[in-house]
Amino acid sequence: MPIESFTHQFEEITYLSDDLQVKALMMTPHHEVKRIVVYLRGGKGQVGRVRAGRLMQFSDSQTLVIGPYYRGNNGSEGKDEFYRGDLNDVTELLRLLHDKYPQAFIHMVGFSRGGLQGLLTFQDLPVNSYIIWGGVSDIDLMYEERVDLRGMLRRMIGHPKKDRAAYEARQAIPNINENSPAILIVHGGKDQQVGIRHAYYLADQLELKGAMHETFYQMAEGHVPRPPAMVETLTYIKEFMNQVELHR
């Protein structure tokens, strides 16, 4: 169903990643593109799929917002590999956008599953900041706390002890250093899907590495903030982007 907007053009685009046709939902402003926000979805398949309403939360009259579906999801070719080949779907999209809009600021937002997706890719890309929102920061911690997802993780990755190399390959912290783009950690204290331990662990590791970061915790909120808290979160995220661009 077409999405109508006075300020942006919505379209589902298809691009090549490892010779696979991968899809993304994009909203492009009718005015000059000065900022790009790449939204990395959570979930898998229909759960957590990219929706126009989510993209619109980050938009303004000069901001292009796009959310890749990842391979094997929502009409994209290939198989979802959960933090392996799908990482290329992110990096290829970022490079295409940077080539088309070389002067635009680029910010990545990784939500839930997308949190680790961004951590595994952002430091090697032409981005100005990374916002991890209710995001997974450690695959072992995810396996430990989400008993209900262990079967899926064993199918897609393996067992954390028997298939240690597969889990180590999905660890992002070793690749982050003091020169990495600025990171904002957003998390709810009552998040039952991705515990706030992920945020605490990431913040501690970034502190040890001397990496530039901020935290924004809403201790009374869950995985998705309630409407008043959502407004606060989005306001904080946009101001963080503004400050990063100001001090570029």
Predicted regions and their residues:
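Short beta-strand element of the alpha/beta-hydrolase
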Residues: 34-43
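N-terminal cap/lid segment of alpha/beta-hydrolase-fold proteins
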Residues: 1-30
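Alpha/beta-hydrolase fold nucleophile elbow
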Residues: 101-112
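C-terminal catalytic histidine-bearing segment of alpha/beta-hydrolase fold enzymes
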Residues: 200, 209-248
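Alpha/beta-hydrolase active-site loop
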Residues: 81-100
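Mobile cap/lid helix-loop segments that gate and shape the active-site cleft of serine hydrolases
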Residues: 135, 140-175
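Short amphipathic alpha-helix adjacent to the substrate-entry channel of hydrolases
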Residues: 49-67
